[in-house]
């Protein structure tokens, strides 16, 4: 009958009045809150817009929720005629456990919860006012007097705490030691489902072993007297598959100041080929290289042209890319904080997020060549 957002809210108590505010919008000729005081009260809002009423724009759900918060609402209930369809279509998503950082949960507990209702649940809450509400909904009239009902809601979800680790390997630089380059890959995958093991050889075993190879190469260079000018932080992160959690934690609790972090090079799935490159394996997708720093982008291209000559494919770097890869790996938490990034990626293949993503399908010549780029860049 209802869903609660944010989904990671684990404890919530509400014992108060619920006030129906109609469509929950505020315009010069139509103000849902004109005669209503909802401060400290829960509000019920219809989705959509009133018919036969001219408004400057169409209000979406997010805008209605923000307005309710500004009015002081303690909780927002919103009726959606698409909820029942959504509950059936995405049942697996609603039923699976949600994972978040402990710090994130603390912040979420302070948020005003959103409860999305089916039509039946919404009318059940309004009880005796059901007929009046239907009339207002159909006509688009404003509410002149508050429709109130008492409400008691208790949410208490069982939770488990788990500990996971990011791994940090630090290589101090020389004359530019205070400038830090962070190189990341995620070492987690999907684990087991029943008796089936999801190995994640490409996603992101290839990135993880690349970090090991890069670390080894830097140590050999240091022994030979060739220290990097800038400091290097090599960081396999955890929790990527559960919401980029490891890199999010680091970005919120950085060991080295983010303002001193010159770039993040992120390696995620570089050992296979996608259908677009079945006949040309000498390529790599670069994502984000020019979003925050043209200098980083130009340096990347120059190094590749001089030493490797990979085909650099920027298809997924487009801001309107429907795949949204720019926001789907760990570099994104650095980019959100203004750190220039490059995401190295060889594309999605038929074994993506399947138990068949296994090691014998990896092209190690490809991954080995790419690790040289990272070593040379800085």
Where would I find each of the regions flagged by the language model?
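A non-catalytic alpha/beta surface segment that caps or lines the substrate-entry region
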Residues: 1-20, 108-170
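Noncatalytic luminal/extracellular "stalk/propeptide" segments of secretory-pathway proteins
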Residues: 1-42, 47-51, 164
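His/Asp/Glu-rich mid-to-C-terminal helical/loop segments that flank catalytic regions of hydrolases
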Residues: 209, 216, 345-378
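Acidic, glycine-rich active-site loops and adjacent beta-strand->loop/helix elements
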Residues: 48-50, 81-83, 187-189, 235-242, ...
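Alpha-helical metal-binding/catalytic segments enriched in His/Glu/Asp
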Residues: 167, 183-243, 374
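Protein/peptide-recognition domains central to ubiquitin and immune signaling
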Residues: 1, 78-99, 116, 126, ...
